[in-house]
Design a protein with these regions (language model features):
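Auxiliary Fe-S-binding modules of radical SAM enzymes
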Residues: 1-45, 216-337
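Conserved Radical SAM active-site core
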Residues: 49-179, 187-189
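Hydrophobic faces of well-ordered beta-strands that scaffold small-molecule active sites
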Residues: 77, 128, 156-158, 179-181, ...
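Short glycine-enriched, charge-decorated loop/helix-capping segments at active-site entrances
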Residues: 95-105, 193-198, 277-286
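Conserved radical SAM core fold
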Residues: 97-98, 137, 162-165, 183-201, ...
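Aromatic/hydrophobic pocket-lining residues that form the small-molecule binding cavity
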Residues: 110-113, 140, 204, 208, ...
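Alpha-helix-loop-beta-strand connector modules within alpha/beta enzyme cores
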Residues: 144-155, 207-211, 289-295
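Anionic-ligand binding region
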Residues: 192-224
Length: 337
């Protein structure tokens, strides 16, 4: 029998609402992410993420471009939040992450977000996959509470850039079933230059330690091979070894566990500022096959055998969203191998 999502246990114990209220208090003087802006988002005072009291949902859809045990046969139920706490110059979702004046039009109530989750479940989606949830973690939790009361029964995926506050992650323990962090850099300099944040290395690694504390290195699957609980660390290979993928792999092995699942991704392509601004020339091309082979070799040499590896051929062409079409922003998606 498939184990129920952990947030339902919290609901039954009467603890889920308490957690939600604790998370929402962080919005009053915002410490929801490591930027610690201290603005009162409950009064819609905005700061770095340009986000106030209510969640912003730019798109929600069944999605088939995630890792195989998240996609299954019916897709992951992706909820794409608008805005972001990072400013990545190569963001593939920049149409929704860095257009705050347009995204305010996509603000929804918590009740409406809960309805979206239930709609995705009704479509047969195997999970609710929150994309870029960090700056909306309290709103996400409130909506999960509302949806759970109305019959939500699928796992919750926290698909994050890893620039997360440990205190927030601790409150999300057992609200989130699956952590899917994108570990971007092994140095602070790259984090500042390419994502406009300070201390990325330290904060992301602290966040991953907390995620690992909650889930361990075991992936829990159901009888159909669908992922129900666990931690999967994504590593996007960037050109010119920006990000130092091998160093991140080694840190995961040594500081977390050699059995942590890694999802190695080849889908990088220059977009947004990386495509046009000469300051970011190191990111101005797709990765070369030699760079990809170096990254896959690092996985093998460091003994990291759990996880998934994208196909190199064509990956940078297939994973190109267009959020002008909010209902189907992804086309022609290939799976991981």
């Amino acid at each position: 029998m498939t184990e129920q999502p952990s947030y339902l246990k919290l609901l039954d114990q009467g603890l889920l609402e308490t957690r939600v209220e604790e998370l929402e208090r962080l919005l009053e003087s915002c410490t929801v992410c490591p930027r610690d802006c201290l603005n009162n988002r409950l009064n819609n005072d905005i700061a770095a993420c340009y986000s106030g009291r209510l969640p912003i949902v730019s798109s929600y859809t069944a999605h088939f471009g995630e890792e195989p045990p998240l996609v299954g046969t019916k897709g992951a139920g992706n909820v794409f939040f608008g805005n972001c706490n990072l400013r990545c110059v190569y963001c593939q979702n920049y149409q929704i992450s860095q257009t705050h004046k347009q995204q305010i039009k996509n603000e929804v109530t918590h009740e409406r977000l809960a309805e979206m989750m239930l709609e995705l479940q009704a479509l047969g989606c195997h999970n609710i996959n929150f994309v870029s949830p960090t700056h909306f973690a309290p709103q996400m939790a409130r909506s999960i509470l509302l949806a759970a009361r109305k019959g939500l029964r699928v796992p919750v995926v926290y698909n994050t850039n890893a620039y997360d506050a440990v205190a927030v992650l601790q409150l999300l323990d057992r609200i989130v079933d699956i952590y899917l962090p994108d570990l971007k850099y092994a140095d602070d300099e790259s984090g500042y230059l390419y994502s406009k944040v300070s201390g990325y290395k330290e904060f992301s690694r602290l966040a991953l330690r907390e995620m690992y504390r909650q889930t361990g290195d075991e992936l829990v699957f159901d009888e159909n091979g669908l992922l129900r609980r666990g931690l999967v660390v994504r590593l996007l290979v960037l050109p010119n070894d920006v990000g130092s993928v091998a160093e991140s792999i080694e840190w995961i092995r040594d500081e977390l566990s050699p059995r942590v699942a890694i999802s190695l991704m080849a889908q990088y392509y220059p977009t947004h500022q990386a495509e046009t601004n000469k300051r970011y020339v190191l990111l101005s091309r797709r990765i070369r096959e030699t760079e990809w082979l170096k990254a896959t070799a690092a996985l093998e040499e460091l003994g990291m055998s759990e996880g998934w590896v994208q196909e190199f051929d064509g990956a940078s062409y297939y994973y190109r969203p267009d959020f002008e079409d909010s209902e189907t922003p992804f086309k022609d998606i290939r799976d991981f191998s």
